[in-house]
């Protein structure tokens, strides 16, 4: 995971391999523009089981173009960049302070050395393969600059150490399990904000209806209490007891953007509230539910922490039962009105022609919750489609609440699901529509624009599986169906 300053733990899953023929001990994310150079790869010791940071030291022999007139450094750098002679390596700055000393002893750390004498001149690191003592390795551009006495090519040793080598996101396969504790230490080193590194020992939800997982601690404390920030909201929970996936942050934001102030939303499988709580901040009335008792507790605490309790009401029920329960209670209950006060900006108060405004004026808005839902959100991809039969006859005998009798439309349903990862998107859409139709008892097809149908790919879960979101208007034939 990549929750740099928020989620205080890191996890490793076990579905995808490291790059072929590489050791997990030495995998690095640094890339060289000219090629994937072995010179910049980390040293390899496949026998290492306990992390030895001192082992990861390496001297890379390069060359540097020392510039005689530092006023011309910009133009010379541009020339070398255009001729592809400049070293372009991730995290390494090519502009260095030139140093006095024997030609063979000009050395600097990858991050730039802070000790030693400097003569005020600068040098530019040159790409791998250019040798100071071999003119045949020089490009025409370098030869021209040397002949013009603009630069001097000198040897330059670049020191790499443990701090230089970073890592790419990886999944831990069985053949790398002997390295798991060593990898845990490396991950903690490379993510200073991380308190704990874990390895998932089974698939999410394989042993729990609450989409949790078993894990082992690879480094740090066995403490899974985390704090996450998303969409200006704060969530605190035990990561081992609820489902959370930061990679869905964009999807959370996209869905919440569909909700409008004053609308009513039924979040059937709400979790800790990544849809519900940001919606509450938008002054959307949310009936939020989660089957997990601990998830429900976190949802309630999150609503209080983010000051949206007036708009977000948490429940702990089975999702199918909740669809009917929430619909009935919303219709039969007394209309809920929230008085929302917004502070008038100082500039607006001062510029207002109405001088009767007090120094600290507030605008007051009254928001009344509708008696029917505008949206149903069902975020349980593995099984959410199976709950769609709860919408059969949901508004039976209540036609007068909707168009054409009023300006209210039947609700939009947003159901998340998995499907196979196919090169033919039409097959994916057809499969999802068939599954939805079976549970609704009403045929929906990919071409059914009248239902405001949208089937959108959310993310690739594995090489063979995708996550989708299907949104459609609840058909009147389903909503008003009599038993």
UniProtKB/Swiss-Prot annotation:
Chain intervals for the UniProt region annotation (Disordered): 1-24
Compartment list: Mitochondrion matrix; Nucleus; Cytoplasm
Keyword set includes Transferase: yes
Function noted in UniProt: Specifically methylates the N1 position of guanosine-37 in various cytoplasmic and mitochondrial tRNAs. Methylation is not dependent on the nature of the nucleoside 5' of the target nucleoside. This is the first step in the biosynthesis of wybutosine (yW), a modified base adjacent to the anticodon of tRNAs and required for accurate decoding.
Keyword Membrane set for record: no
Keywords, in A-Z order: Cytoplasm, Methyltransferase, Mitochondrion, Nucleus, S-adenosyl-L-methionine, Transferase, tRNA processing
Catalytic activity line of the entry: guanosine(37) in tRNA + S-adenosyl-L-methionine = N(1)-methylguanosine(37) in tRNA + S-adenosyl-L-homocysteine + H(+)
Biased composition (Low complexity): 9-24
SUPFAM superfamilies registered for this protein in UniProt: S-adenosyl-L-methionine-dependent methyltransferases
Binding site for S-adenosyl-L-methionine: 252, 290-291, 379
Pfam family, one: TRM5-TYW2_MTfase
Coiled-coil annotated residue ranges, if any: none
Catalytic EC class: transferase
Single Gene Ontology MF annotation: tRNA (guanine(37)-N1)-methyltransferase activity
HAMAP family documented for this protein: TRM5
Assigned protein family: Belongs to the class I-like SAM-binding methyltransferase superfamily. TRM5/TYW2 family.
Organism this protein belongs to: Ajellomyces capsulatus (strain G186AR / H82 / ATCC MYA-2454 / RMSCC 2432) (Darling's disease fungus)
GO annotations of cellular component type: mitochondrial matrix; nucleus
This protein's name: tRNA (guanine(37)-N(1))-methyltransferase
Subunit description: Monomer.
Gene3D superfamilies: Met-10+ protein-like domains, Vaccinia Virus protein VP39
InterPro entries: MeTrfase_TRM5/TYW2 (IPR030382), SAM-dependent_MTases_sf (IPR029063), TRM5-TYW2-like_MTfase (IPR056743), TRM5/TYW2-like_N (IPR056744), tRNA_Gua_MeTrfase_euk (IPR025792)
EC annotation from Swiss-Prot or TrEMBL: 2.1.1.228
């Amino acid at each position: 995971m990549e929750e740099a300053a928020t989620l205080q733990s890191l996890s490793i899953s076990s579905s995808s391999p490291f790059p072929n023929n590489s050791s997990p001990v030495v995998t690095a994310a640094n890339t060289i523009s000219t090629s994937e150079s072995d010179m910049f790869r980390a040293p390899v010791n496949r026998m290492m089981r306990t992390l030895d940071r001192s082992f990861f030291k390496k001297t890379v022999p390069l060359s540097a173009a020392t510039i005689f007139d530092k006023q011309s450094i910009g133009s010379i750098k541009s020339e070398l960049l255009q001729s592809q002679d400049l070293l372009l390596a991730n995290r390494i700055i090519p502009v260095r302070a030139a140093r006095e000393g024997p030609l063979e002893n000009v050395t600097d750390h990858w991050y730039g050395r802070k000790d030693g004498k400097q003569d005020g001149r600068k040098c530019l690191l040159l790409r791998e393969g250019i040798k100071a003592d071999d003119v045949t390795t020089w490009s025409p551009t370098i030869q021209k600059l040397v002949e013009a006495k603009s630069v001097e090519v000198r040897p330059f040793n670049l020191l790499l150490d443990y701090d230089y080598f970073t890592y790419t996101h990886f999944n831990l396969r069985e053949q790398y399990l002997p390295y798991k504790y060593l990898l845990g230490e490396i991950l903690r080193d490379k993510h200073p904000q991380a308190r704990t590194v874990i390895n998932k020992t089974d698939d999410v939800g394989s042993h729990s209806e609450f989409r949790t997982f078993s894990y082992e601690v690879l480094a740090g404390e066995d403490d899974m209490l985390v704090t996450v920030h998303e969409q200006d909201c704060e969530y605190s929970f035990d990561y081992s007891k609820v489902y959370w996936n930061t990679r869905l942050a964009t999807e959370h934001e996209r869905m919440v953007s569909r909700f409008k102030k004053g609308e009513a939303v039924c979040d059937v499988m709400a979790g800790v509230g990544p849809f519900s709580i940001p919606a509450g901040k938008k002054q959307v009335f949310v009936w939020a539910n989660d089957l997990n008792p601990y998830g429900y507790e976190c949802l309630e605490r999150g609503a209080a922490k983010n000051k949206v309790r007036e708009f977000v009401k948490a429940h702990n029920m089975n999702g199918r039962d909740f669809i009917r329960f929430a619909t009935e209670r919303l219709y039969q209950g007394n209309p809920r009105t929230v008085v929302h006060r917004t502070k008038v900006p100082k500039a607006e108060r001062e510029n207002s022609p109405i001088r009767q405004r007090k120094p600290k004026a507030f605008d007051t808005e009254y928001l009344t919750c509708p008696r029917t839902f505008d949206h149903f959100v069902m975020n349980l991809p593995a099984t959410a489609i199976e709950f769609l039969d709860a919408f059969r006859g949901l508004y039976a005998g209540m036609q007068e609440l909707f168009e054409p009798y009023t300006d209210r439309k039947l609700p939009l349903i947003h159901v998340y699901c998995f499907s196979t990862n196919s090169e033919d998107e039409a097959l994916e859409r057809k499969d999802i529509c068939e599954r939805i139709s079976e549970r609704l008892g009403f045929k929906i097809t990919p071409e059914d624009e009248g239902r405001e149908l949208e089937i959108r790919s959310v993310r690739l879960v594995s090489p063979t599986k995708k996550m989708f979101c299907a949104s459609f208007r609840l058909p009147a034939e389903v909503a008003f169906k009599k038993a």
